[in-house]
UniProtKB/Swiss-Prot annotation:
Gene3D superfamilies: ATP-grasp fold, A domain, ATP-grasp fold, B domain, Phosphohistidine domain. Keywords: Antibiotic biosynthesis, ATP-binding, Ligase, Nucleotide-binding. It comes from the Bacteria. Belongs to the PigC family. The keyword Methyltransferase does not apply. The keyword Transcription does not apply. It is an enzyme of class 6 (ligase). It comes from Serratia marcescens. This is Prodigiosin synthesizing transferase PigC. Involved in the biosynthesis of 2-methyl-3-n-amyl-pyrrole (MAP), one of the terminal products involved in the biosynthesis of the red antibiotic prodigiosin (Pig). Catalyzes the transfer of 2-methyl-3-n-amyl-pyrrole (MAP) to 4-methoxy-2,2'-bipyrrole-5-carbaldehyde (MBC) to yield prodigiosin. It is able to use substrates with a variety of monocyclic rings in place of the pyrrolic ring A of its natural substrate. Pfam families: PEP-utilizers (PF00391), PPDK_N (PF01326). Its EC number is 6.4.-.-. Pathway: Antibiotic biosynthesis; prodigiosin biosynthesis.
Amino acid sequence: MNPTLVVELSGDKTLEPHRLGGKAHSLNHLIHAGLPVPPAFCITAQAYRQFIEFAVPGALLDTGAPGNVRDMILSAAIPAPLDLAIRHACKQLGDGASLAVRSSALEEDGLTHSFAGQYDTYLHVRGDDEVVRKVQSCWASLWAERAAQYSRTSAAQSDIAVVLQIMVDADAAGVMFTQDPLTGDANHIVIDSCWGLGEGVVSGQVTTDSFILDKASGEIRERQIRHKPHYCQRDPQGRVTLLQTPEARRDAPSLTPEQLQQLARLARQTRMIYGAELDIEWAVKDDRVWLLQARPITTQAKPVQMLYANPWESDPTIKERAFFSRMDTGEIVTGLMTPLGLSFCQFYQKHIHGPAIKTMGLADIGDWQIYMGYLQGYVYLNISGSAYMLRQCPPTRDEMKFTTRYATADIDFSGYKNPYGPGVQGWAYLKSAWHWLKQQRHNLRSAGATVDAMIALRQRETRRFLALDLTTMTHQELERELSRIDGYFLDSCAAYMPFFLQSFALYDALALTCERYLKGRGNGLQNRIKASMNNLRTIEVTLGILSLVETVNRQPALKALFERHSAQELVTVLPTDPESRAFWQSDFSAFLFEFGARGRQEFELSLPRWNDDPSYLLQVMKMYLQHPVDLHTKLRETERLRHEDSAALLKAMPWFGRMKLKFITKLYGVMAERREATRPTFVTETWFYRRIMLEVLRRLEAQGLVKSADLPYVDFERFRAFMAGEQSAQEAFAADLIERNRHQHLLNLHAEEPPMAIVGGYQPRMKAPTAENAAGMLSGLAASPGKVVAKARVITDLLAQAGELQPNEILVARFTDASWTPLFALAAGIVTDIGSALSHSCIVAREFGIPAAVNLKNATQLINSGDTLILDGDSGTVIIQRGERADG
């Protein structure tokens, strides 16, 4: 084997970085120090240069056209001596061995430049021929636009080496940092670990455990043991696939104390060798720890600073005194969001929200900067700014009534004054009140027509969009399509907003009336009253799924397919199998036409909708087939209880109070129905945005400009600037921007969740450990009346864990949105960390007649699947009784 072309990484100190590239030199450095590194060879930078001189004409190199050079590299034959040397290295690593083929740029993994993700890496590669092809792909990645742009700004050399390394078939794997990545504290080692291969950690596909260790002693300072429903492993073809974690390991630590000590010792040694803080990829096999990669942390953490939800605010008084809350922000933005989701919310804030709220009757919609705010990946409403604007309207003239409904118990309003000022006064207020009154008259007269128009718009635009072939449309045609979506997105949000706000106002009026006339006896009534809301869209989805299940039950051959295949398999089986093709093309397609734009966190454009991935729907259908649900009977029983409860309480009220309550109840039901009828229209428009983004990224990936997998880290407003011709692809999808966004999202995942409501600044910190095996009572908000004793089922990943829910278990979740509704039909009760009186969990739980308690803050951390819970939906309390875990 020619050592100038291919060399074994043996720890030989004479092997220099300009031959090996950063990654290979780093591995060789670790091997020299005696650290455990899997066997590896390096195809040197000289080998790449020899190939380029042989395969690519100098004239082509001089043109500077990366795409043409890349194509030439991929199609050219490798000189025989080099080809033989690569194959010999494969043989040395083991015939049929599973290899990692990794790019090793000359300055990659250096102390000043990371290049993480800019050049190609291929894992679990088998066979000499495939290894040779992947080596060429790594060479070609040097000429990808994303890498070329990044390397120009970093002044990197234009040669590249490639590492061939034995893959560790890991029992557990992950990453560790030799300093706290959030705070920069160099006294800590932070470790993330999962079962199986580490690809799931890097990609975010799997849930991880987290550990914080004292660097000097290795003592465990904090640990977060999470429910881990899935892990990554290789299938027989060598492909990385997502598998269900065995029940016994789902809530068990993925690392033992001894393994943590091994990792801490290796972290200290590696840190000493490099003389810099590192992030290290590692794997454990048969209780032995292997180091896979070590990269200096080139983006140094800054000292922890106070964060503000409105960092753009220049007035320090407003910055310190503005009140922000994420209570009742709507399920479309509840929970942690990716950089793409956050940037889409900012697009909405700047271009949609203001014109949309004008339909509420606001004469002055203010400035976009006072609508919303953002903290560590979470979206907030600027309550101070909203209350200031709403003083234009007579019903919300008392701003503290509006403000306090968004507060949590820990917010102290003594001495609070709205930092934006007192709002409109005198003659200006009279004019704004008159404007509001005229708008309400218009809204009431046009409400029915508005609902009909929004339903028709959604159906018409869905039909039109599904008929488009995005792959054949030009850049300009896609840009025109985006502009069309902008217009209808604004129209549908403007139509929805009055119904949304009126529902809130009427629910508050309902609560006040119950309190005035019934005192404490009215709690159950205000939670059950809803005036024939059986047509809510969330209920329609579940009824639609049940209708599909009835169709399947009538066809034995089709039912057999559902019983034989997993939900993921059914996605490919149903469209092609003769027994199911008609069902897929008719009944199922009709359902998707109506509801397919639904999904989780619908402003989070990185998440697939049911049209994109129907496996969740198919999983629910499998559950309903196994555990039949009589939803119509359940809804009738709920209505009967509501009627009996209401009649008994109303009878004790004076006639005026009785008439007032009946009127509010009826009006609330009408507004809630209108709200739910118009909401799907703007949700559908967000799916159109997502589909066009995916198509554009597909094209850019083919040009080597960006990877489709980078979608969560793309900035939506930069994407729009690129589509409008205002920015180049290199500017809009700059590699360093994508990497910064990825890094920030990783920090948000590790950080403690910021408060639900906050005045002024917030100091971020890493997630604090929760009391393990805690038992006792949790208190939250009474959401849906009733009491139940049942086993808990904690679900933190809907798509991955939906199939775990068993009939008559209490569903425990961070929060729920419309996509969770089908599970409510099986649950005995609902418990959530986040929620309010009008959140999805409450509305649907009341409709299904099951008790619910929401806003318990950390229920998903304190409750384990299998615990016995005593859920009191009238008081909002949950008592945890530790016991045997539920099966499966």
